[in-house]
Amino acid sequence: MIVSGELPAGERLVEIPTAERLGVSRMPVRMAFRTLEQEGLLSKNEGRGYTVRTVTGEEIAGAVEVRGVLEGLAARQAAERGLDPTTQEALQQCLATGDVLFAKGYVTEEDMEVYHDFNRRFHQVIIEASGNPAISHALARNDHLPFASVSSLAVDRNDMAREYRRFNFAHMQHHAIVDALVNRQGARAEALMREHANATMRYADLFGSPHIDHEGLKVIRDM
């Protein structure tokens, strides 16, 4: 609701009215407020309640750049260690799913739900393959802004042709990354992964624009 613009920046939120608005008890609302505060989407008021924060395109871009560095490091370390058969199979499954998705030459909103799932899995497999838990911890600290992590995906429903080109290109990058990993080309894998993060910079453009069309924006997040 915050990212979609239904709850605009500056709006004050209090537990009871919000719970009544959503038709739920106070406890899940209280927990959601705390989580959103940690993610940087809400700021706690001195008295009661919270206020919806303004998230700038510059903040998103900065967090995405940091993610690229961390995931690039994960890719390099995974390539240098070598991939075990289970990891290779998991990555190949992600590639195969994406190949089928983009083969028809267009994408639907439902397709983007599928993309969100296998893309998140793709990134997680590489992070785990690095064998470096510090990377996961650092990413968790960085993922406090919307779209700083791969757990969130924004789709511009007003221009699905453009979104097809953008995500199809990102999937082609998936193929190149896997090729570098399999061939144990650490420097190449790192460079490709960092460049891959730049595909998310479109979010900084979307949310940094004063003319953002919230109605045309579909946000897909982990449940």
Annotate each predicted stretch with a short phrase.
Residues 15, 92-95, 99, 151-159, ...:
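Membrane-interacting alpha-helical segments
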Residues 85-156, 173-176, 180, 188-200:
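Conserved amphipathic alpha-helical segments that form helical-bundle/coiled-coil interaction surfaces
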Residues 44-45, 119, 169-171:
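Short, flexible turn/loop "capping" segments at secondary-structure junctions
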Residues 10, 48, 52-55, 106-107, ...:
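Short amphipathic alpha-helical segments at helix-loop
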Residues 68, 92, 168-172:
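Amphipathic alpha-helical repeat elements characteristic of tetratricopeptide repeat
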